[in-house]
Amino acid sequence: SYPVGKIGLNQEMSPLIFSLIRILMMVIFLFPFLRFSSIKKANFKFVLVYGFLMGLGLYPLMYLSLAQTTSTSSMILVMQFSIPFGVIAGSIYLGENVSQKRWLLISLVLFGLAIICFDPIVLQSPYSLILGCLAAISYGLASMISRKLADFNALEVNGWMAITTLPIMTILAFLFQNQEFKIILPHSL
């Protein structure tokens, strides 16, 4: 999705509007898969947390990062921080057992990613690097939370994510991308 996102952002579309369109399409396509009885399940709160981390954390931050960077491939690498971060967060918050071998491998991954991120082309866009790291943290936390979602299928989780974040994303896009929002709105009616 990174190259497609970069192409979309290069076509004069703002990151928040791009995120809003992505979430809106998810609502349209995934609505038929929602089971409203799921709201009563004890773990539904984790669906909401997952949704906010993905819909309001990962997507907008990732697209803001892509809009600021000169190197899409470097942002793809930065997003790989999400994997070790998810394992670390799972160890801390969920009490998951992580072997010494896995800690060693996580350290090597973090060290390798840190070396790659000091490539001069990455450092040309420090704001993009920060946004990419925040997106990776959000994605890592969402990955950790997803372990609590065994009672739900993936289509349903993503559908709830889209429905719960659509109103907030719409407000954010309207507040921060007001001009573009006003241009798009009449064309969609």
Regions found by a protein language model. Name each.
Residues 1-17, 121-148, 167-171:
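Glycine-/small-residue-enriched transmembrane alpha-helix faces in small-molecule transporters
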Residues 3-12, 66-68, 115-127, 175-189:
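Membrane-interface helix termini and inter-helical loops of multi-pass transporters
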Residues 16-32, 49, 105-108, 127-131, ...:
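Hydrophobic alpha-helical transmembrane segments of multi-pass integral membrane proteins
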Residues 17-28, 54, 63-97, 135:
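Specific alpha-helical transmembrane segments that line the substrate/conduction pathway
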Residues 30, 50, 89, 101-118, ...:
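Hydrophobic transmembrane alpha-helices of multi-pass small-molecule transport proteins
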Residues 41-42, 46, 73-79, 95-115, ...:
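Loop-to-transmembrane alpha-helix entry segments
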